[in-house]
Amino acid sequence: MEDIVIVGRHAVKEAIVSGHTINKIWIQEGIRKQQINDILQNAKEQKLIVQTVPKSKLDNLANAPHQGVAALIAPYEYADFDQFIQSQKDKEGLSTVVILDGLEDPHNLGSILRTADASGVDGVIIPKRRSVALTQTVAKASTGAIQHVPVMRVTNLAKTIDELKEHGYWVAGAEADNATDYRDMAADMPLAIVIGSEGQGMSRLVKDKCDFYIKIPMVGHVNSLNASVAASLMMYEVYRKRHQVGDNA
């Protein structure tokens, strides 16, 4: 796999701090050093290559706003599913994973990773086919959360769900019909939340594997939410049910 370019101050900073392999950092000419002091300091401590370049070079490297900073890094590695399951056996508290069935928008995946990190979700599972991969755009949208949330890429989602069930997980599918209000769902057990694709929802095989279905009430004129918005509401509902007000653990 080829190295990839990431852009933006948050994404680059988190890549450095997390220990990701970084081959080069580009800084825009004329940028105020105090705006990127943390990046420069961390890069110096790790003896990383830093080059000052014209804005035009960063514009050519990036397909998104770059804030005057970019980096060439090693490809993102996917977490191993079996190792992840083992790690969850040793953790305190109840495990939560999010399964994305056919999500193809990189901005949605990045946003979901950002909320997953913020709400304490333990991991995200995506299929190898019909799904966006971990790309520069995903990294930018996640504002660095891509470095902290394990993402597992599996061949067969239905089989993976069976394995999750064997390890005690209950599987909740986001579904509009014949579903429980997400505010009434149980969260006192290891939980896997399935979010379907933006256009088609969950595939039939995956849908049939769910233990129960949850929905978000819609009282306006539109009948659906963006996948990342729906996922965020559900992730934080799990957090709300498991933590008292003032408990930031």
From Swiss-Prot:
Known EC number: 2.1.1.-
A molecular function (GO) term: RNA binding
Cystine connections: none
Name of the top EC class for this enzyme: transferase
Gene Ontology CC annotations of this record: cytosol
SUPFAM superfamilies: alpha/beta knot, L30e-like
Keyword match Transferase: yes
Record-listed S-adenosyl-L-methionine binding positions: G196, I216, L225
UniProt keyword annotations, A-Z: Methyltransferase, Transferase
Methyltransferase keyword on record: yes
GO BP annotations, alphabetical order: methylation; RNA processing
Highest taxon, organism lineage: Bacteria
Pfam families in the record: SpoU_methylase, SpoU_sub_bind
Database matches in PANTHER family: 23S RRNA (GUANOSINE-2'-O-)-METHYLTRANSFERASE RLMB
Family: Belongs to the class IV-like SAM-binding methyltransferase superfamily. RNA methyltransferase TrmH family.
Name the UniProt record assigns to this protein: Putative TrmH family tRNA/rRNA methyltransferase
Species of the source: Staphylococcus haemolyticus (strain JCSC1435)
